[in-house]
Each structure stands twice: as structure tokens, then as C-alpha cells.
Design a protein with these regions (language model features):
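Alpha/beta enzyme core
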Residues: 1-77, 82-105, 124, 132-137
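C-terminal helical cap(s) of enzyme catalytic domains, especially alpha/beta-barrels
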Residues: 96, 110-147
């Protein structure tokens, strides 16, 4: 859909959500040829918030703290492409420490060697501020317990 159609749809569903007390998640989409700059993400998250989204899902990028500082609603990061477990934990840690409210990871949890252990390690990083290295060690220990 075009950007204009997307904004109309967003506005429609935000109004419906408000009517029924349902929070709306705004998602910053990037196509293959769209830029992934701090400026783009800051503008897109701000636009979604000003349209009335209650929480925003976007990608982690350089200068992420500028994006979270400029956005008046909570931001969660998308997990993006599958990366090694230590990298996913590090990205989650940096994002939360730069202002993200949390993470929304799919393939970095579901495609991990042990998804349940990875989910617990991500929780440790996001909710307990455990450093990525310690969370990865916990992941390795939890993997042994599952097997």
C-alpha cells in the first residue's frame, strides 16, 4: 500500500482502538530500498506516535537513543534477521539501555538452538539489566538443563 493509504489505515484503526480501549502498535516498515538511518527512524516513530499509536515497533540502529528521546510513546525493537545468540543479546541490551521499552524478537528466539533458553536469556537482559555476556552464559547453562 502507498504511504497515504497506510496513514489512512493507521488512523482508522487507532480510532477504532480508542473506541474499544485497545492499544495500537505502530510498526516502522522498511522495504529493501528504503533508508535505515537515524533520521528516518526518528521521523517515522514520531509520525506514528503523533497519529496516536500507543507503542512503536522499529529497528535498532546507530544513535538509537536519539530515536527514543524524540518519541513520546514506548518503543520496542524488532529482532530483525537471525544473528548469533550473543549478538541478539547484545542488541537487546544496547536497545534497552538506550531507551527501548523492550524487544519483539521472532527468529532470534525461535531459530535459536534452544528457544526456551534464549527467551529466558532475553528476559534477563530486558527485565533484569543483565549484561549480554552473563545472559549468554546463562543461556548455555539453560540449554544443558533442557537437553
Amino acid at each position: 500500500a502507498s504511504e497515504i493509504a497506510s496513514l489512512h489505515n493507521l488512523s482508522y484503526y487507532i480510532n477504532k482502538g480508542e473506541r474499544y480501549g485497545i492499544p495500537v502498535l505502530g510498526v516502522v516498515a522498511v522495504g529493501k530500498e528504503m533508508e535505515r538511518t537515524t533520521r528516518y527512524f526518528a521521523l517515522a516513530t514520531r509520525l506514528l506516535a503523533e497519529q496516536g499509536a500507543h507503542i512503536i515497533k522499529t529497528y535498532y540502529c546507530e544513535n538509537f537513543e536519539q530515536i527514543t528521546a524524540a518519541c513520546p510513546v514506548p518503543i520496542v525493537i524488532a529482532g530483525g534477521k537471525k544473528v548469533p545468540e550473543p549478538e541478539a543479546l547484545d542488541m537487546a541490551y544496547r536497545a534497552v539501555n538506550e531507551g527501548a521499552a523492550g524487544v519483539d524478537m521472532g527468529r532470534n528466539v525461535l531459530q535459536a538452538e534452544c528457544p526456551s533458553a534464549m527467551l529466558q536469556a532475553i528476559r534477563m537482559v530486558v527485565h533484569e539489566n543483565v549484561k549480554p555476556e552473563a545472559a549468554y552464559k546463562a543461556y548455555q547453562t539453560l540449554m544443558k538443563d533442557v537437553k
